[in-house]
Design a protein with these regions (language model features):
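Membrane-embedded alpha-helical segments of multi-pass membrane proteins
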Residues: 12-20, 58-59
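Membrane-interface alpha helices of multi-pass inner-membrane proteins
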Residues: 35-51, 62-63, 81-83, 162-166
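Short acidic/glycine- and proline-prone juxtamembrane loop motifs at membrane-interface regions
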Residues: 3-13
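Transmembrane alpha-helix segments characteristic
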Residues: 146-170
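Structural signal for membrane-spanning alpha-helices in multi-pass inner-membrane proteins
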Residues: 2, 22, 61-65, 88-92, ...
Length: 172
C-alpha cells in the first residue's frame, strides 16, 4: 500500500512503455539484435506519447552508459522514434505548441519559493513508496555502486528522477 496509489492510474501507459523499455534495454545489453532495437523504438515512442517525462528515462540511461552513443543502430532507433512521433509534433505545431505554452508560461506557479516545497519532496518520496520505504531505500543504496550496466541504469533513473524533481521543487 502507498499513499499515492490512485495517482498511478493516469500513468499506466507510461508504466507499460517504461517496463517495455527496461525489458528492451536489458535485451539490448545482452543480445543487440533486431528485436531489441525495434522494442527500444516502440517503447521510447510510447513513453514520449504517454508523458514527456519519458525523455528523462532515456536521458538517465544514456548518462549511465555513454557507450550507447557509439552504436549507430541506436541512432537509427532515434530516427525511428522521431518518425513515430511526427504526428504529435505536427499536432503541436498546428495548435501553436499548447504543451510547451502550458508548462513554461501558463501553469500556475508560486510567486516566491518556500522551504516547505522542497521538504515535502522528501516526505512525498517516502509516501509514494509506502510502508516498505525502508526496505526499498536500503536496497537502492546497497546497489548504488553496481557496475552491471542494467543495474547502473536503474540507479541513474531513480537518482535522476529524485534529483530532477527536487530541483524543480525550488521553482515552486
Amino acid at each position: 500500500l502507498n499513499v499515492y496509489g490512485f495517482i498511478t492510474t493516469p500513468d499506466t501507459p507510461l508504466l507499460l512503455f517504461f517496463s517495455l523499455f527496461l525489458f528492451a534495454y536489458k535485451n539490448y545489453l545482452t543480445k543487440k539484435n533486431t528485436v531489441s532495437y525495434l522494442l527500444l523504438t516502440l517503447s521510447i515512442s510510447g513513453m514520449m506519447y504517454s508523458k514527456y517525462q519519458g525523455v528523462l528515462i532515456v536521458f538517465f540511461i544514456v548518462l549511465s552508459n555513454w557507450k550507447l552513443v557509439k552504436d549507430y543502430k541506436l541512432w537509427l532507433v532515434c530516427l525511428g522514434v522521431i518518425i513515430l512521433y511526427i504526428p504529435h509534433l505536427t499536432w503541436q505545431y498546428i495548435n501553436d505548441f499548447p504543451s510547451i505554452r502550458y508548462h513554461l508560461y501558463e501553469r500556475a506557479s508560486v510567486a516566491s519559493y518556500r522551504i516547505e516545497y522542497s521538504l515535502m519532496h522528501f516526505v512525498n518520496a517516502i509516501a509514494i513508496i509506502g510502508f516498505t520505504f525502508i526496505i526499498i531505500y536500503k536496497a537502492f543504496f546497497r546497489g548504488i555502486k553496481s557496475t552491471y550496466l542494467y543495474h547502473k541504469g536503474l540507479n541513474y533513473i531513480i537518482s535522476g528522477f529524485f534529483i530532477f524533481f527536487l530541483l524543480s521543487s525550488f521553482i515552486g
